[in-house]
Regions:
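N-terminal accessory segment detector
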Residues: 1-144, 163, 168-178, 182-185
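Active-site helix/loop of acyl-thioester processing domains in fatty-acid/polyketide metabolism
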Residues: 144-159
Length: 185
């Protein structure tokens, strides 16, 4: 059994980046970076929700997952904008947040995108995707929720309309998940 990561601290202060804290006055788990209450979910929880969506809505479930991610990504982007940090600091924080929240490890060209003004279709690579490892091998892309999160956050932070398509996925047998941001005109 793997040793637990030091992600939970009792009543940590605002400088406690990279951790989830328990607010001792409320007993609730919080993200001190985004200043939001959090809940921890496991792979079975996500798989159960996903499987029920697919059994109820068939192929429409992927659109629902994408829309849910889009909404969350937009809210995350707005929350990060409120922090009055430079775009580079915001993007670095977003990448770190991916690790802290357990999404996986991001490799993105976002810093280059900000500096060069977004040309082409940037790829966002996600290693060890929580969503893909939760579902297992299916032979198709499965990270619709993450694609929505990437699109939503990018729209807010880069102030352009995007769709995000997952082209590579662990569920298809690829070594990592890869998403392409496509600007909408």
């Amino acid at each position: 059994m793997a040793s637990p990561l030091p992600l939970l601290k009792e009543d940590a202060d605002e400088t406690s980046e990279g951790v989830i804290v328990r607010n001792t006055s409320t007993g609730q788990l919080e993200d001190p970076f985004l200043k939001l209450r959090v809940m921890i979910i496991d792979e079975e929880f996500y798989r159960g929700v996903r499987d029920k969506l697919y059994s109820s809505f068939k192929s429409g479930a992927s659109a629902i997952l994408y829309a849910m991610g889009l909404g969350y990504g937009e809210l995350m982007g707005l929350k990060m904008e409120e922090m009055k940090m430079s775009k580079i600091e915001v993007i670095r924080s977003f990448i770190d947040l991916g690790k802290t929240k357990g999404y996986g490890k991001f490799h993105t060209p976002f810093l280059k995108m900000i500096l060069s003004g977004l040309m082409g279709e940037p790829a966002v690579r996600l290693e060890d995707s929580f969503f893909a490892t939760s579902v297992g091998k299916t032979g198709k892309t499965e990270c619709f929720l993450m694609a929505g999160i990437i699109a939503g956050a990018s729209q807010v932070l880069l102030q352009k309309k995007f769709s995000c398509i997952e082209e590579k996925c662990l569920c298809k047998g690829d070594e990592y998940c890869e998403f392409k941001l496509k600007e909408k005109y």
